[in-house]
């Protein structure tokens, strides 16, 4: 597990390379906003080398985040992309199209239109009431899985245009993929009779592992894909939980605060994921070597595998997530086919409505 000192030192090197264009889905609050401030702080003296698209629902909060970040990093370019509900694939498509439009019409410094970093932190309360979107997806499953894969696929033209290795980061439950039995194959929608936030986590983390590995293979040397568990981070998410949870959390907070991650540290860890330590598959671009004891291992247990599942300090959780007893020759294809079929079906239906 890298220390915060190691993490900060690595992040401090980000401005030394070429300029960075980033997009943060869910960047108006919580972890997304902590990351935004970490990027602004990192580029405090190099503002002209940073452009960030903040995607979210609340324009007021976005204005506050952007104002604070511009003060921290004078000269940096911050843009708000409004999305009413990122559980909807149509809103993901709309947001992605707007990013592509703006980046194509006015590429950063007149350089090639591209996206170097894509962070996805958008979420809904995991203990809230089950809700089905107008597109037919469970809102929780969509927010933490389907909409995130859609973001990646829609923004691939910009991501693969990056002169760097583009980094894609999904913040949810990396390293928490354990609990899958050898005879289980949690691919598809969570059946109603076993629906629970733990079951949703099992299905979505299982599929995400295999789809990220598939993308890492398809876009070797171009994409690094990371699924991370941020730890217990104090923020507005707790106020959106059911009343019983808020009361319990208030009573337990003096104790839980001992285990909480500070917002500044969380933001710095998120920024650390943009460094070359998390390399694409087959990339030799400043990639760590297997002799590096702190080198992150991919979900396949190798250094530089391109698809990573990490704990709250960006530490590899390989033994838990390799699914050695669950991997079959067609597991990856099943996860990929289900995901693409689901997204394509929704896109076709949306096209007939538009």
UniProtKB/Swiss-Prot annotation:
Leader peptide range in chain numbering: none
Protein name, per record: Short-chain dehydrogenase/reductase SAT2
Taxonomic lineage of the native organism: Eukaryota, Fungi, Dikarya, Ascomycota, Pezizomycotina
Note: Trichothecenes are sesquiterpenoid toxins that act by inhibiting protein biosynthesis.
UniProt function note: Short-chain dehydrogenase/reductase; part of the satratoxin SC1 cluster involved in the biosynthesis of satratoxins, trichothecene mycotoxins that are associated with human food poisonings. Satratoxins are suggested to be made by products of multiple gene clusters (SC1, SC2 and SC3) that encode 21 proteins in all, including polyketide synthases, acetyltransferases, and other enzymes expected to modify the trichothecene skeleton. SC1 encodes 10 proteins, SAT1 to SAT10.
Keyword Zinc recorded: no
Keywords, ordered alphabetically: NADP, Oxidoreductase
Residues where NADP(+) binds: 31, 85, 201, 233
GO terms assigned for molecular function: oxidoreductase activity
Disulfide pairings: none
Encoding gene (name): SAT2
PANTHER family: ALCOHOL DEHYDROGENASE-LIKE C-TERMINAL DOMAIN-CONTAINING PROTEIN, YALI0E05731P
Pathway(s) it belongs to: Mycotoxin biosynthesis
Family: Belongs to the short-chain dehydrogenases/reductases (SDR) family.
This enzyme's EC code(s): 1.-.-.-
